[in-house]
Amino acid sequence: MKLTKTSLNGVQFFYREGYSDIKTFIEVLSNQSYLKKGMEVLNNESWLDCGGNVGAFSLLAASKGASVITYEPDPFNCELIEKNAKLNGFQNAITVKQAALVHDFRKDTTLSIAQNGNVWRNTIMKKKSNKAIKVPCLNFDEQAVLADNCKMDI
């Protein structure tokens, strides 16, 4: 899979060509979609990024001096988040947990991988998919106490 490197608003990142990655980075880093909705990220805050996708919000928060725990069930997205955190020197600010957040205490679930590169459409809902993988789960209530703020996009 080919990765292309670029930057927006001073944040560098790799994205996968032919996937929805670049659209997500533009929406979050360039268009500032979360900040336009009244969300504010302050220096020294701690955040949970629930449904981290490719890590665009995590990079945004870390660039503002916040620490972030990113939850993302797709292992390929997790690799990309870690690579981009390292690229920006944010490996101490962004912690990636490869897991689906759930309301109960199940240990794992099945993640249906979206087709056509639309990785924001991955789901743990029962859905026919050409590709599905088993992923670990974490209980949301237990994780919620770990940070001051939460961005949830799941």
Identify the function of each model-found stretch.
Residues M1-I154:
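Phosphate/nucleotide-binding beta-alpha loop and adjacent structural elements of enzyme active sites
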